[in-house]
Protein backbone atom coordinates (compact mmCIF):
# COMPACT_ATOMS: atom_id res chain seq x y z
CA UNK A 1 0.00 0.00 0.00
CA UNK A 2 1.33 3.44 -0.95
CA UNK A 3 1.86 5.71 2.07
CA UNK A 4 4.33 8.48 2.85
CA UNK A 5 7.09 7.35 5.23
CA UNK A 6 6.77 10.49 7.38
CA UNK A 7 3.00 10.35 7.58
CA UNK A 8 1.99 6.70 7.53
CA UNK A 9 -1.72 7.49 7.61
CA UNK A 10 -1.60 9.59 4.39
CA UNK A 11 -2.33 7.68 1.15
CA UNK A 12 -0.44 8.66 -2.01
CA UNK A 13 -0.72 8.02 -5.77
CA UNK A 14 1.42 5.03 -6.78
CA UNK A 15 2.32 6.73 -10.09
CA UNK A 16 3.11 10.40 -9.36
CA UNK A 17 3.61 10.26 -5.59
CA UNK A 18 1.13 13.04 -4.76
CA UNK A 19 -0.82 12.72 -1.52
CA UNK A 20 -4.59 12.53 -1.37
CA UNK A 21 -4.67 16.15 -0.12
CA UNK A 22 -2.88 17.32 -3.28
CA UNK A 23 -5.34 15.78 -5.76
CA UNK A 24 -9.12 15.80 -6.27
CA UNK A 25 -9.61 12.02 -6.28
CA UNK A 26 -7.52 9.04 -5.28
CA UNK A 27 -8.84 5.71 -6.56
CA UNK A 28 -7.82 2.50 -4.80
CA UNK A 29 -6.87 -0.77 -6.48
CA UNK A 30 -5.98 -4.10 -4.81
CA UNK A 31 -2.46 -2.90 -3.89
CA UNK A 32 -2.10 0.50 -5.59
CA UNK A 33 -3.65 3.98 -5.80
CA UNK A 34 -4.06 6.28 -8.80
CA UNK A 35 -5.05 9.95 -8.77
CA UNK A 36 -7.40 11.79 -11.17
CA UNK A 37 -4.46 13.67 -12.74
CA UNK A 38 -2.69 10.44 -13.73
CA UNK A 39 -5.96 9.02 -15.10
CA UNK A 40 -6.39 12.10 -17.27
CA UNK A 41 -2.80 11.80 -18.50
CA UNK A 42 -3.35 8.13 -19.41
CA UNK A 43 -6.52 9.03 -21.32
CA UNK A 44 -4.61 11.67 -23.30
CA UNK A 45 -1.87 9.16 -24.21
CA UNK A 46 -4.44 6.59 -25.39
CA UNK A 47 -6.33 9.23 -27.39
CA UNK A 48 -3.11 10.35 -29.13
CA UNK A 49 -2.25 6.75 -30.04
CA UNK A 50 -5.77 6.19 -31.40
CA UNK A 51 -5.46 9.29 -33.60
CA UNK A 52 -2.12 8.02 -34.91
CA UNK A 53 -3.63 4.63 -35.76
CA UNK A 54 -6.53 6.31 -37.59
CA UNK A 55 -4.14 8.54 -39.54
CA UNK A 56 -2.23 5.47 -40.73
CA UNK A 57 -5.47 4.09 -42.18
CA UNK A 58 -6.87 0.57 -41.80
CA UNK A 59 -4.28 -2.01 -40.75
CA UNK A 60 -4.30 -4.81 -43.35
CA UNK A 61 -3.72 -7.37 -40.59
CA UNK A 62 -6.87 -6.12 -38.84
CA UNK A 63 -8.76 -5.36 -42.08
CA UNK A 64 -12.05 -7.30 -42.23
CA UNK A 65 -12.04 -10.04 -44.87
CA UNK A 66 -14.49 -9.70 -47.80
CA UNK A 67 -16.93 -12.16 -46.19
CA UNK A 68 -16.82 -10.21 -42.92
CA UNK A 69 -17.40 -6.91 -44.76
CA UNK A 70 -20.45 -8.39 -46.52
CA UNK A 71 -21.83 -9.71 -43.22
CA UNK A 72 -21.77 -6.20 -41.75
CA UNK A 73 -23.33 -4.77 -44.93
CA UNK A 74 -26.11 -7.37 -44.54
CA UNK A 75 -26.96 -5.84 -41.15
CA UNK A 76 -27.77 -2.47 -42.74
CA UNK A 77 -28.67 -3.13 -46.40
CA UNK A 78 -31.36 -5.59 -47.50
CA UNK A 79 -30.75 -7.68 -50.64
CA UNK A 80 -28.29 -6.60 -53.35
CA UNK A 81 -26.05 -9.59 -52.57
CA UNK A 82 -24.01 -9.47 -55.78
CA UNK A 83 -23.32 -5.75 -55.37
CA UNK A 84 -22.23 -6.34 -51.76
CA UNK A 85 -19.78 -9.05 -52.84
CA UNK A 86 -18.30 -6.81 -55.54
CA UNK A 87 -17.92 -3.92 -53.07
CA UNK A 88 -16.45 -6.09 -50.30
CA UNK A 89 -13.75 -7.51 -52.59
CA UNK A 90 -12.96 -4.12 -54.19
CA UNK A 91 -12.61 -2.31 -50.86
CA UNK A 92 -10.51 -5.10 -49.32
CA UNK A 93 -8.15 -5.08 -52.31
CA UNK A 94 -7.98 -1.27 -52.28
CA UNK A 95 -6.60 -1.09 -48.75
CA UNK A 96 -4.26 -4.05 -49.35
CA UNK A 97 -2.93 -2.07 -52.33
CA UNK A 98 -2.21 0.95 -50.09
CA UNK A 99 -0.21 -1.28 -47.74
CA UNK A 100 1.73 -2.84 -50.62
CA UNK A 101 2.49 0.52 -52.25
CA UNK A 102 4.06 1.74 -49.00
CA UNK A 103 6.82 -0.88 -49.40
CA UNK A 104 9.64 -0.10 -51.88
CA UNK A 105 10.08 -2.39 -54.87
CA UNK A 106 6.52 -3.76 -54.83
CA UNK A 107 4.52 -4.31 -58.02
CA UNK A 108 2.58 -1.15 -58.85
CA UNK A 109 -1.16 -1.83 -58.60
CA UNK A 110 -3.84 0.37 -60.11
CA UNK A 111 -6.60 1.81 -57.94
CA UNK A 112 -9.99 0.09 -58.24
CA UNK A 113 -12.59 2.84 -58.03
CA UNK A 114 -16.21 1.68 -58.09
CA UNK A 115 -19.26 2.53 -60.20
CA UNK A 116 -22.67 1.64 -58.72
CA UNK A 117 -25.61 1.43 -61.12
CA UNK A 118 -29.17 1.16 -59.85
CA UNK A 119 -32.51 2.93 -59.46
CA UNK A 120 -33.20 5.66 -56.91
CA UNK A 121 -33.51 4.34 -53.36
CA UNK A 122 -31.91 0.96 -54.05
CA UNK A 123 -29.15 1.43 -51.44
CA UNK A 124 -26.17 2.90 -53.32
CA UNK A 125 -25.45 5.71 -50.84
CA UNK A 126 -26.10 3.51 -47.80
CA UNK A 127 -23.65 0.89 -49.06
CA UNK A 128 -20.89 3.49 -49.44
CA UNK A 129 -21.61 5.04 -46.02
CA UNK A 130 -21.60 1.63 -44.32
CA UNK A 131 -18.30 0.68 -45.95
CA UNK A 132 -16.65 3.80 -44.52
CA UNK A 133 -18.10 3.03 -41.08
CA UNK A 134 -16.80 -0.57 -41.18
CA UNK A 135 -13.30 0.57 -42.10
CA UNK A 136 -13.35 3.60 -39.76
CA UNK A 137 -12.18 5.99 -42.47
CA UNK A 138 -13.41 9.53 -43.29
CA UNK A 139 -16.36 9.65 -45.69
CA UNK A 140 -17.70 12.46 -47.86
CA UNK A 141 -20.56 12.77 -50.33
CA UNK A 142 -21.01 14.99 -53.36
CA UNK A 143 -23.72 15.51 -55.96
CA UNK A 144 -22.37 15.47 -59.50
CA UNK A 145 -25.18 17.75 -60.72
CA UNK A 146 -23.72 20.64 -58.66
CA UNK A 147 -20.24 20.30 -60.13
CA UNK A 148 -18.75 22.41 -62.92
CA UNK A 149 -15.25 22.63 -64.29
CA UNK A 150 -13.00 25.38 -62.94
CA UNK A 151 -13.93 28.91 -63.98
CA UNK A 152 -17.70 28.40 -64.26
CA UNK A 153 -20.54 29.14 -61.87
CA UNK A 154 -21.09 26.13 -59.64
CA UNK A 155 -19.06 23.98 -57.26
CA UNK A 156 -15.42 23.29 -58.12
CA UNK A 157 -14.56 19.60 -58.38
CA UNK A 158 -11.78 20.05 -55.81
CA UNK A 159 -14.37 21.11 -53.22
CA UNK A 160 -15.19 17.39 -52.97
CA UNK A 161 -11.75 16.91 -51.42
CA UNK A 162 -12.49 19.74 -48.98
CA UNK A 163 -15.62 17.89 -47.81
CA UNK A 164 -13.50 14.81 -47.08
CA UNK A 165 -10.90 16.93 -45.31
CA UNK A 166 -13.63 18.40 -43.08
CA UNK A 167 -14.90 14.88 -42.30
CA UNK A 168 -11.33 14.02 -41.21
CA UNK A 169 -11.15 17.11 -38.94
CA UNK A 170 -8.57 18.58 -41.33
CA UNK A 171 -6.20 15.65 -40.72
CA UNK A 172 -4.64 15.38 -44.20
CA UNK A 173 -3.14 11.92 -43.58
CA UNK A 174 -6.53 10.47 -42.61
CA UNK A 175 -8.31 12.21 -45.49
CA UNK A 176 -5.86 10.70 -47.98
CA UNK A 177 -7.13 7.22 -47.07
CA UNK A 178 -10.84 8.08 -47.03
CA UNK A 179 -13.82 7.26 -49.24
CA UNK A 180 -15.70 9.74 -51.45
CA UNK A 181 -19.15 8.94 -52.85
CA UNK A 182 -20.28 10.95 -55.89
CA UNK A 183 -24.02 10.60 -56.51
CA UNK A 184 -25.95 11.30 -59.74
CA UNK A 185 -22.82 10.56 -61.77
CA UNK A 186 -24.99 9.64 -64.76
CA UNK A 187 -26.09 13.29 -65.02
CA UNK A 188 -22.63 14.37 -66.24
CA UNK A 189 -22.75 12.14 -69.32
CA UNK A 190 -22.46 14.15 -72.52
CA UNK A 191 -25.57 14.40 -74.62
CA UNK A 192 -24.19 12.25 -77.45
CA UNK A 193 -21.45 9.63 -77.72
CA UNK A 194 -19.44 11.79 -80.14
CA UNK A 195 -16.96 14.41 -78.83
CA UNK A 196 -18.37 17.94 -78.69
CA UNK A 197 -16.53 20.91 -80.21
CA UNK A 198 -18.42 23.29 -77.90
CA UNK A 199 -17.81 23.64 -74.17
CA UNK A 200 -19.93 21.26 -72.08
CA UNK A 201 -19.75 22.89 -68.63
CA UNK A 202 -21.73 20.29 -66.71
CA UNK A 203 -20.99 17.18 -68.82
CA UNK A 204 -17.74 16.23 -70.53
CA UNK A 205 -15.94 19.17 -68.89
CA UNK A 206 -16.80 17.85 -65.42
CA UNK A 207 -15.71 14.36 -66.43
CA UNK A 208 -12.32 15.76 -67.43
CA UNK A 209 -12.03 17.68 -64.15
CA UNK A 210 -13.04 14.63 -62.06
CA UNK A 211 -10.63 12.44 -63.99
CA UNK A 212 -7.61 14.14 -62.43
CA UNK A 213 -8.62 13.66 -58.81
CA UNK A 214 -10.02 10.14 -59.34
CA UNK A 215 -6.86 8.77 -60.95
CA UNK A 216 -4.63 10.46 -58.36
CA UNK A 217 -3.21 13.95 -58.11
CA UNK A 218 -2.09 16.44 -55.48
CA UNK A 219 -5.09 18.73 -55.16
CA UNK A 220 -4.80 22.29 -53.86
CA UNK A 221 -7.79 22.82 -51.60
CA UNK A 222 -8.92 26.21 -50.20
CA UNK A 223 -9.18 25.61 -46.43
CA UNK A 224 -12.50 27.47 -46.20
CA UNK A 225 -13.97 26.29 -49.49
CA UNK A 226 -15.28 28.49 -52.27
CA UNK A 227 -13.37 29.71 -55.31
CA UNK A 228 -9.59 29.95 -55.46
CA UNK A 229 -7.72 33.24 -55.68
CA UNK A 230 -3.97 33.92 -55.98
CA UNK A 231 -3.44 35.35 -52.47
CA UNK A 232 -5.00 32.34 -50.79
CA UNK A 233 -3.09 29.59 -48.98
CA UNK A 234 -3.97 26.03 -49.99
CA UNK A 235 -3.93 22.64 -48.31
CA UNK A 236 -2.23 19.94 -50.39
CA UNK A 237 -4.10 16.61 -50.52
CA UNK A 238 -2.83 13.58 -52.47
CA UNK A 239 -5.86 11.73 -53.89
CA UNK A 240 -3.87 8.65 -55.00
CA UNK A 241 -5.18 6.46 -52.16
CA UNK A 242 -8.67 7.93 -51.82
CA UNK A 243 -11.31 5.42 -52.90
CA UNK A 244 -13.94 6.93 -55.18
CA UNK A 245 -17.38 5.33 -55.39
CA UNK A 246 -19.66 6.82 -58.05
CA UNK A 247 -23.37 6.05 -58.29
CA UNK A 248 -26.31 6.80 -60.53
CA UNK A 249 -29.66 5.53 -61.80
CA UNK A 250 -28.54 5.52 -65.47
CA UNK A 251 -32.05 5.81 -66.91
CA UNK A 252 -31.97 4.76 -70.56
CA UNK A 253 -28.82 2.65 -70.27
CA UNK A 254 -30.93 -0.51 -70.48
CA UNK A 255 -31.95 0.50 -74.02
CA UNK A 256 -28.30 0.64 -75.07
CA UNK A 257 -27.73 -2.82 -73.55
CA UNK A 258 -30.84 -4.15 -75.33
CA UNK A 259 -29.52 -2.96 -78.66
CA UNK A 260 -26.16 -4.63 -78.02
CA UNK A 261 -27.51 -8.03 -77.01
CA UNK A 262 -30.24 -7.97 -79.66
CA UNK A 263 -33.33 -7.93 -77.43
CA UNK A 264 -36.20 -6.63 -79.52
CA UNK A 265 -39.51 -5.24 -78.38
CA UNK A 266 -42.77 -6.03 -80.13
CA UNK A 267 -45.52 -3.43 -80.45
CA UNK A 268 -46.64 -1.01 -77.79
CA UNK A 269 -48.98 -3.18 -75.72
CA UNK A 270 -49.23 -2.81 -71.96
CA UNK A 271 -48.09 -6.41 -71.35
CA UNK A 272 -44.96 -5.96 -73.45
CA UNK A 273 -44.15 -2.66 -71.71
CA UNK A 274 -44.52 -4.29 -68.32
CA UNK A 275 -42.20 -7.09 -69.37
CA UNK A 276 -39.53 -4.67 -70.60
CA UNK A 277 -39.69 -2.61 -67.36
CA UNK A 278 -39.23 -5.77 -65.33
CA UNK A 279 -36.12 -6.64 -67.32
CA UNK A 280 -34.53 -3.18 -67.06
CA UNK A 281 -32.85 -3.89 -63.71
CA UNK A 282 -31.68 -7.30 -64.87
CA UNK A 283 -30.16 -5.79 -68.01
CA UNK A 284 -27.96 -3.42 -65.97
CA UNK A 285 -26.22 -6.44 -64.44
CA UNK A 286 -24.74 -7.14 -67.88
CA UNK A 287 -23.42 -3.61 -68.45
CA UNK A 288 -20.03 -3.27 -70.16
CA UNK A 289 -17.59 -0.34 -70.49
CA UNK A 290 -18.67 -0.02 -74.14
CA UNK A 291 -22.27 0.59 -73.01
CA UNK A 292 -21.07 3.40 -70.73
CA UNK A 293 -19.19 4.99 -73.64
CA UNK A 294 -22.38 5.03 -75.70
CA UNK A 295 -24.26 6.47 -72.72
CA UNK A 296 -21.99 9.52 -72.84
CA UNK A 297 -18.88 8.92 -70.76
CA UNK A 298 -15.40 9.56 -72.12
CA UNK A 299 -13.08 6.50 -72.38
CA UNK A 300 -10.59 7.84 -69.81
CA UNK A 301 -13.35 8.32 -67.22
CA UNK A 302 -14.77 4.81 -67.74
CA UNK A 303 -11.23 3.42 -67.47
CA UNK A 304 -10.82 4.96 -64.00
CA UNK A 305 -13.94 3.17 -62.71
CA UNK A 306 -13.05 -0.47 -63.42
CA UNK A 307 -15.29 -2.08 -60.78
CA UNK A 308 -18.94 -2.16 -61.87
CA UNK A 309 -21.73 -3.20 -59.48
CA UNK A 310 -25.42 -3.18 -60.39
CA UNK A 311 -28.26 -2.88 -57.88
CA UNK A 312 -31.76 -4.11 -58.69
CA UNK A 313 -35.02 -2.31 -57.99
CA UNK A 314 -36.49 -3.20 -54.61
CA UNK A 315 -39.77 -5.14 -54.55
CA UNK A 316 -42.53 -5.05 -51.94
CA UNK A 317 -41.04 -7.86 -49.84
CA UNK A 318 -37.64 -6.15 -49.72
CA UNK A 319 -39.27 -2.85 -48.71
CA UNK A 320 -41.02 -4.53 -45.76
CA UNK A 321 -37.71 -6.11 -44.71
CA UNK A 322 -35.99 -2.71 -44.89
CA UNK A 323 -38.65 -1.27 -42.58
CA UNK A 324 -38.09 -3.77 -39.77
CA UNK A 325 -34.88 -5.84 -40.13
CA UNK A 326 -31.70 -3.67 -40.38
CA UNK A 327 -29.97 -2.44 -37.23
CA UNK A 328 -31.12 1.09 -37.99
CA UNK A 329 -34.55 0.08 -39.37
CA UNK A 330 -37.17 2.85 -39.40
CA UNK A 331 -39.62 0.82 -37.30
CA UNK A 332 -36.95 0.33 -34.62
CA UNK A 333 -36.16 4.06 -34.66
CA UNK A 334 -39.78 5.08 -34.11
CA UNK A 335 -40.24 2.41 -31.44
CA UNK A 336 -37.23 3.84 -29.60
CA UNK A 337 -38.72 7.35 -29.75
CA UNK A 338 -41.96 6.08 -28.20
CA UNK A 339 -40.06 3.99 -25.66
CA UNK A 340 -38.50 7.23 -24.41
CA UNK A 341 -42.07 8.36 -23.66
CA UNK A 342 -42.67 5.00 -21.87
CA UNK A 343 -45.07 3.94 -24.63
CA UNK A 344 -44.95 0.73 -26.67
CA UNK A 345 -45.35 1.25 -30.43
CA UNK A 346 -46.68 -1.57 -32.59
CA UNK A 347 -46.99 -1.76 -36.39
CA UNK A 348 -49.35 -4.35 -37.86
CA UNK A 349 -48.12 -6.45 -40.79
CA UNK A 350 -50.72 -4.74 -42.96
CA UNK A 351 -49.34 -1.30 -42.12
CA UNK A 352 -45.83 -2.28 -43.21
CA UNK A 353 -47.15 -3.66 -46.51
CA UNK A 354 -49.13 -0.44 -47.05
CA UNK A 355 -46.00 1.67 -46.50
CA UNK A 356 -44.05 -0.51 -48.96
CA UNK A 357 -46.80 -0.26 -51.59
CA UNK A 358 -46.96 3.52 -51.25
CA UNK A 359 -43.17 3.82 -51.67
CA UNK A 360 -43.29 1.64 -54.79
CA UNK A 361 -46.10 3.77 -56.19
CA UNK A 362 -44.01 6.93 -55.70
CA UNK A 363 -40.98 5.22 -57.32
CA UNK A 364 -38.65 6.70 -54.70
CA UNK A 365 -37.25 3.39 -53.45
CA UNK A 366 -36.24 2.92 -49.82
CA UNK A 367 -35.52 6.63 -49.30
CA UNK A 368 -39.25 7.36 -49.67
CA UNK A 369 -40.19 5.19 -46.69
CA UNK A 370 -39.36 7.81 -44.06
CA UNK A 371 -41.51 10.55 -45.58
CA UNK A 372 -44.50 8.17 -45.73
CA UNK A 373 -44.00 7.21 -42.09
CA UNK A 374 -43.46 10.80 -40.95
CA UNK A 375 -46.73 11.83 -42.57
CA UNK A 376 -48.64 8.95 -40.96
CA UNK A 377 -47.06 9.44 -37.52
CA UNK A 378 -47.13 13.24 -37.26
CA UNK A 379 -50.37 13.65 -35.28
CA UNK A 380 -49.72 10.85 -32.82
CA UNK A 381 -46.14 12.04 -32.18
CA UNK A 382 -47.55 15.51 -31.54
CA UNK A 383 -50.16 14.24 -29.03
CA UNK A 384 -48.42 11.44 -27.10
CA UNK A 385 -45.89 13.54 -25.09
CA UNK A 386 -48.79 15.50 -23.55
CA UNK A 387 -50.94 12.48 -22.69
CA UNK A 388 -50.74 10.41 -19.51
CA UNK A 389 -51.24 6.71 -18.79
CA UNK A 390 -50.73 5.72 -22.44
CA UNK A 391 -49.53 2.12 -22.58
CA UNK A 392 -49.44 1.28 -26.29
CA UNK A 393 -50.02 2.78 -29.74
CA UNK A 394 -50.98 0.53 -32.66
CA UNK A 395 -50.45 1.61 -36.29
CA UNK A 396 -52.72 -0.20 -38.75
CA UNK A 397 -53.00 -0.22 -42.53
CA UNK A 398 -55.81 2.35 -42.42
CA UNK A 399 -53.59 4.78 -40.49
CA UNK A 400 -51.10 4.75 -43.37
CA UNK A 401 -53.89 5.50 -45.84
CA UNK A 402 -55.27 8.29 -43.55
CA UNK A 403 -58.57 6.45 -43.13
CA UNK A 404 -58.44 6.26 -39.33
CA UNK A 405 -56.33 7.33 -36.36
CA UNK A 406 -53.88 5.08 -34.48
CA UNK A 407 -55.30 2.88 -31.73
CA UNK A 408 -54.26 4.14 -28.28
CA UNK A 409 -54.26 1.66 -25.38
CA UNK A 410 -54.33 3.22 -21.90
CA UNK A 411 -53.12 1.74 -18.63
CA UNK A 412 -55.84 0.55 -16.29
CA UNK A 413 -56.17 2.06 -12.82
CA UNK A 414 -55.01 -1.25 -11.33
CA UNK A 415 -51.84 -1.24 -13.48
CA UNK A 416 -50.95 2.32 -12.54
CA UNK A 417 -51.53 1.74 -8.84
From Swiss-Prot:
Q: Which residues bind ATP?
A: 119-126
MF terms from GO for this chain are: ATP binding; ATP hydrolysis activity; ATP-dependent protein folding chaperone; protein dimerization activity; unfolded protein binding; zinc ion binding
Q: Which residues bind Zn(2+)?
A: 13, 16, 35, 38
**What biological-process terms (Gene Ontology) are attached?**
cell division; proteolysis involved in protein catabolic process
- Statement: the UniProt record of this protein carries the keyword Transit peptide: no
Keyword list (alphabetical) reads: ATP-binding, Chaperone, Metal-binding, Nucleotide-binding, Zinc
Q: Which InterPro entries match?
A: AAA+_ATPase (IPR003593), ATP-dep_Clp_protease_ClpX (IPR050052), ATPase_AAA_core (IPR003959), Clp_ATPase_C (IPR019489), Clp_protease_ATP-bd_su_ClpX (IPR004487), ClpX_bact (IPR046425), P-loop_NTPase (IPR027417), Znf_CppX_C4 (IPR010603)
For this protein, the record's Gene3D superfamilies field holds:
1.10.8.60, ClpX chaperone, C4-type zinc finger domain, P-loop containing nucleotide triphosphate hydrolases
A Pfam family this chain is assigned to = zf-C4_ClpX
A GO CC term assigned to this protein in UniProt = HslUV protease complex
Which part of the chain is the ClpX-type ZB domain?
A: 1-54
Q: Does the keyword Chaperone apply?
A: yes
Protein family according to the UniProt entry: Belongs to the ClpX chaperone family.
The record's annotation in PANTHER family points to: ATP-DEPENDENT CLP PROTEASE ATP-BINDING SUBUNIT CLPX-LIKE, MITOCHONDRIAL (PTHR48102:SF7), ATP-DEPENDENT CLP PROTEASE ATP-BINDING SUBUNIT CLPX-LIKE, MITOCHONDRIAL-RELATED (PTHR48102)
Complex formation: Component of the ClpX-ClpP complex. Forms a hexameric ring that, in the presence of ATP, binds to fourteen ClpP subunits assembled into a disk-like structure with a central cavity, resembling the structure of eukaryotic proteasomes.
Function, please? ATP-dependent specificity component of the Clp protease. It directs the protease to specific substrates. Can perform chaperone functions in the absence of ClpP.
Q: What name does this protein carry? A: ATP-dependent Clp protease ATP-binding subunit ClpX
Species this chain originates from: Geotalea uraniireducens (strain Rf4)
What's the encoding gene here?
clpX
Amino acid sequence: MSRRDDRSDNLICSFCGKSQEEVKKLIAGPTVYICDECIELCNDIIAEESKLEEAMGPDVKKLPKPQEIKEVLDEYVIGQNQAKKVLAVAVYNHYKRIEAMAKPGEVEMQKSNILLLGPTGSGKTLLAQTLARILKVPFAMADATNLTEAGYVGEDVENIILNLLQAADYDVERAQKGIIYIDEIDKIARKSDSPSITRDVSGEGVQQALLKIIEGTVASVPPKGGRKHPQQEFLKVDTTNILFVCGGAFAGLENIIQQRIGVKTLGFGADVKKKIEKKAGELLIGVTPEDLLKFGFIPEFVGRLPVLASLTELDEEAMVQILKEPKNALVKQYQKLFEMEHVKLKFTDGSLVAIAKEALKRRTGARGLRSILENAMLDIMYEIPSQVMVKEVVISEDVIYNKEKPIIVYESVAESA
